[in-house]
């Protein structure tokens, strides 16, 4: 007898709650349809549901996100790097205390080698037709960052191999909830043909019809709740095997209705979050402005805070990291979150004078200053002018429009080509292609769990 099983999946919501009421309505509607046809449907979230750029998530350290997943009655979740490395250790340890669903991650441990109390390496689920589905889960191993937060993250592929060995003789179907990204997921499909489906995330790919790799179906639904994915499995329950598998996505902009209850719940949580973030941090005696393409007060204040916090010789901060001004008078946690919502941590790198000068030259180009940035933790619009503390950078605009750096001093002394300097900056510059010499620096120290807005708060209390 042939039966259909649906696996609905969300990934990388990043606390874009504006789409969540539609997602809830869509999944609830589909559940009703499948129930009428006596067909089973399961629902999964594949991580990065949390993002502290959103003030409700910030105020509750992600617990409202877990509330939303509870209310949707999901069957299981994986964790992403936003759950894993943007929360203080004690907040991640408590994040899923009230979860009504299993959180599946096999490669995360505390420093004593124990899994978090809420984590399981896999789930064996008995389906309505009596077949058994093994649900595995892994997260992307950002080793040095997890280590700084007193967690141990291990190789995901080794854990997938171990988990398959444990479940393969007991499972009719094996699926993987993977927060690794498409390149690693394709490699996992090649390495582990025992997997039937990989529900993937992290790299925000939209696989409208899935992707078949080595007989393994990969499915991903982009980001921000723009889509919900659905994997449809056609199963021969008598032979206990899958005979067909396919993937699709639903564009939420085309879904006409939303859950009124969910919308009301979120509005209530917004009011509560505003109260939680109303604590006064400090008082400004005058307005503090931000200008993205020239030096201004707030980016300069952040640069000074970064230099002092990290104990670096100099610091460098792009002006676009500050999204708006602050008015004179009391400054609250909500104010600081509004102007600096990014889940970005301080970092120091060690650069020779030659490499530092090259980086400063690159930062001064119009191409970099005007660059529109997406990802890397940045939740703003544009890079903007680089602002320094501990360094004086003199530039001039040439006739051809190119900006030239004509003079650099470090704490009053001319920059020395062979001397090694400690530079405080943003962890986003250690990733991607923005500043290769920072990214490739051998000596880096991450300062965690504090975000940049925490440094601003600290500076304002001085």
Residue ranges: model-predicted function:
Residues 50, 84, 140-141, 181-182, ...:
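Short, glycine-/Ser/Thr-/acidic-enriched flexible segments
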Residues 236-330:
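A short C-terminal boundary segment appended to hydrolase-like catalytic domains
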Residues 144-148, 230, 253-260, 326-328, ...:
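A short, polar/proline- and glycine-enriched secondary-structure boundary/capping micro-motif
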Residues 169, 308, 423:
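Metal-centered catalytic cores of metalloenzymes
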Residues 26-29, 309, 359-366:
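Structured segments of extracytoplasmic/periplasmic soluble domains
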Residues 17, 327-462:
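Feature captures C-terminal
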Residues 1-251, 295-300, 305, 446, ...:
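Acidic, metal/ion-coordinating pockets
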Residues 9-11, 202, 222, 318-320, ...:
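Active-site proximal loops enriched in glycine and acidic residues that flank catalytic Cys/His/Asp
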């Amino acid at each position: 007898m042939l039966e259909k099983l649906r696996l609905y999946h969300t990934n990388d919501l990043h606390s874009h709650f504006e789409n969540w009421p539609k997602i809830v309505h869509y999944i609830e509607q589909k559940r009703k349809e499948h129930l009428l046809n006596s067909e089973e449907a399961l629902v999964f979230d594949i991580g990065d549901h949390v993002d502290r750029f959103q003030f409700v998530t910030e105020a509750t350290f992600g617990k409202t996100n877990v509330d939303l997943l509870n209310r949707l009655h999901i069957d299981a979740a994986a964790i992403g790097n936003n759950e894993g490395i943007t929360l203080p250790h004690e907040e991640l340890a408590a994040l899923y205390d009230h979860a009504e669903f299993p959180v599946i991650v096999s490669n995360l441990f505390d420093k004593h080698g124990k899994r978090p109390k809420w984590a399981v390496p896999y789930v064996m689920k008995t389906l309505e037709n009596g077949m058994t589905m093994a649900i595995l889960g892994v997260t992307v191993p950002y080793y040095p960052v997890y280590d700084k937060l007193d967690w141990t993250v291990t190789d995901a592929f080794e854990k997938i191999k171990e988990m398959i060995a444990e479940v393969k003789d007991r499972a009719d179907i094996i699926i993987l909830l993977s927060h690794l990204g498409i390149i690693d997921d394709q490699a996992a499909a090649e390495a582990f043909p025992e997997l039937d489906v990989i529900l993937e995330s992290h790299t925000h790919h939209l696989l409208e019809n899935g992707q078949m790799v080595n007989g393994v179906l990969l499915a991903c639904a982009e980001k921000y709740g723009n889509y919900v994915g659905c994997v449809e499995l056609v199963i021969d329950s008598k032979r206990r095997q899958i005979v067909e598998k396919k993937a699709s996505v639903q564009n939420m902009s085309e879904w006409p209705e939303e859950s009124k209850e969910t919308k009301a719940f979120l509005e209530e949580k917004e009011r509560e979050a505003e109260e939680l973030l109303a604590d006064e941090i400090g008082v400004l005696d005058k307005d503090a402005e931000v200008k993205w393409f020239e030096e201004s007060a707030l980016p300069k204040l952040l640069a000074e805070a970064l230099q002092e916090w990290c104990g670096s010789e100099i610091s460098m901060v792009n002006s676009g990291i500050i999204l708006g001004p602050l008015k004179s008078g009391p400054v609250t946690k909500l104010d600081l979150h509004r102007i600096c919502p990014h889940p970005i941590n301080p970092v120091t790198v060690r650069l020779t004078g030659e490499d530092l000068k090259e980086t400063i030259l690159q930062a001064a180009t119009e191409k970099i200053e005007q660059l529109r940035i997406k990802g890397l933790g940045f939740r703003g619009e544009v890079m903007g002018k680089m602002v320094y503390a501990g360094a004086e950078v003199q530039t001039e605009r040439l006739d051809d429009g190119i900006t030239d750096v004509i003079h650099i001093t470090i704490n009053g002394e001319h920059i020395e080509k062979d001397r090694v300097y400690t530079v405080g900056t943003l962890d986003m510059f250690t990733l991607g292609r923005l500043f290769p010499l920072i990214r490739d620096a051998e000596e880096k120290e991450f300062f965690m769990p504090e975000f940049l807005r925490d440094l601003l708060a600290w500076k304002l209390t001085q």
